[in-house]
Amino acid sequence: MHMRRLLFCALMAGLFLAALGGRASAYPQFQFSSGTTRCSQCHYSPAGGGLITSWGRDESGDTISLGGDGAFLHGLWEPPSWLALGADVRLAALANASGGPESPQFAFFPMQTDGYARFAFGDQVSLYLEGGIRGDVGRDESFSGRTSSVGDRFISNEHYLMWHPSATGPYVRAGRFFAPFGLRFVEHIFYVQRYTGYDLYNETYNVSGGYVGDDWELHVSLFTPPPTSFPEPLQSVGIRESGLAAYGEKRFNGMAMVGLQARLGTGSEVSRYVGGAVGKLWLEDIKMLALGEADFVRQIVSVGSGTVGQNQFVSYLGATFFPIRGLMAGIAYERFQEDLAVAGTGHNAVDLEVNFFPWAHIELLALGRYQFIGPSSATDEASASLFMLQLHYYL
């Protein structure tokens, strides 16, 4: 009877979440800086991201924010032990200057509306469901225009079944999610996500397994895009690839980590072979986390009856400061070299970001980004700027 009730609740939650898409992401800046060394301490996912655990909820009120109760519904109601729920809502306002007669452009829109549910079948097996409404600037800015397009933007980026008998140790999961790889930022616009197969709404179906230890972890995934026969809410965007991804991480003294990674993806139009590394270093005296990622990419494009290949490089190097509780401010430099053999094909970006957590469940964000192509920003056509304000509420 208990199992049948769980299955019924899972079905009802799936229908509910389908009516709420965005991206189930994490904040890699909180590793080490919050006193937490493993991303899976705060998230149910063994690689971090998505619905947060009871530990993560405690941290959101006691460490990350200025105060408040981080529990679901602010502690007004506690779900049963076999059920975990959550939601993310983001509202954004932006100014985008990319050149041309219509620049700059201004927009205000709902960036993310996601709901999460996790059902535990005993102590070892769980079902995870996520669903929401794709963020969209849209051409019709009226309220009626916004609401009339909601039905066309249903999406479920993550849904999987997982065997994970303990917080550390082996695990296996199967379903739709991003195969563990890279720094895994909230900001999908960063080059290290856009050009390695981890762009927005590009989650794949995977069979993934690995091991999470106290000071190391390993994740290996076989991935493939959603079948074209699947309904629209289960489809992905971007390059369709199938292949293998692997990520390994070693942590040192609760203050640093080094990770190695590889991703081999093949498709009918484009194939990519990626190898790289990530790293973090926490400096307690100055309350600063340095973090970076660098990847070499071999991209092969099908042209007629043949192929054309090019070598690429993509990187991120940043520093995030935590001057006071509830506030973090970061600066970063990004580089994407579209073809290492051709001069002037480099894309550069400088990012300034401030995140303020005044109370548990609430985040205010300001992001400034300047991009330029080539060795300098000598012309307007070769540069672009973005400024964005965000209000984030998580349940």
Identify the role of each PLM range.
Residues T36-P46:
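The canonical Cys-X-X-Cys-His
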Residues R38, F356, A382-L395:
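Outer-membrane beta-barrel "beta-signal"
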Residues P46-G48, L91-A97, G131-V137, R176-P180, ...:
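Transmembrane beta-strands of outer-membrane beta-barrel pores
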Residues A47-L51, A84-A93, E102-P227, E249-M255:
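Outer membrane beta-barrel
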Residues P79-S81, F119-D123, P165-A167, V212-E217, ...:
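Outer-membrane beta-barrel strand-turn architecture
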Residues S81, E102-M111, D152-N157, Y201-Y205, ...:
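Residues that define the transmembrane beta-barrel architecture of outer-membrane proteins
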Residues L83-V89, L127-L129, P170-V172, L218-V220, ...:
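Transmembrane beta-strands of outer-membrane beta-barrel proteins
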Residues I239, A246-L340:
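Detector for outer-membrane/organellar transmembrane beta-barrel domains
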